[in-house]
């Protein structure tokens, strides 16, 4: 069986610092970025809600033209099934 690379195919803003993320395997995860924003200085700029909402999807979920990003695998493993 061929291994599937996990890719984000859609991400939707829910509220606060939570996104609903859909993967290429058909599964969805709710992921709250509150803890990451508070703990890791690189994510601190996302504490401004308008910046947090300005994400894009590439090979990762990213902000600020790739200056801030997070791997799909991390979201998948640490998010809650939606």
Where are these regions (language model features)?
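Motif-centric detector for short Cys/His coordination patterns
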Residues: 1-82
